[in-house]
Amino acid sequence: MAIIPKNYARLESGYREKALKIYPWVCGRCSREFVYSNLRELTVHHIDHDHTNNPEDGSNWELLCLYCHDHEHSKYTEADQYGTTVIAGEDAQKDVGEAKYNPFADLKAMMNKKK
């Protein structure tokens, strides 16, 4: 686990303030819009997961709501547990495809079946 520096809050406020000035207050995944009153729920995600990589142009930052940020980091936890590969910004379920089986496909016939 990474060691959190003592001045982390100061570092975070620096890049957070910059990111909020650069990007619109919208979650990069779910497109939820934010206003000043709920801005604390909008977080800055480091795309490469390196919190020391803070370029002035914001190219390593992405604004995510709390829920999407948790989801993004949970993919890496699952990858560590199950040995899968995760590409930053991509959904782990992307290649799985849609479900093929429909349990209700023949429901009407099953309900009309006489005993």
Curated annotation (Swiss-Prot):
The keyword Hydrolase applies. CDD domains: HNHc (cd00085). It holds the Pfam family HNH. One of its GO terms (cellular component) is cytosol. Keywords: Hydrolase, Nuclease. One of its GO terms (molecular function) is endonuclease activity. Its EC number is 3.1.-.-. Belongs to the HNH nuclease family. This is Putative HNH nuclease YajD. It comes from Escherichia coli (strain K12). The gene is yajD.
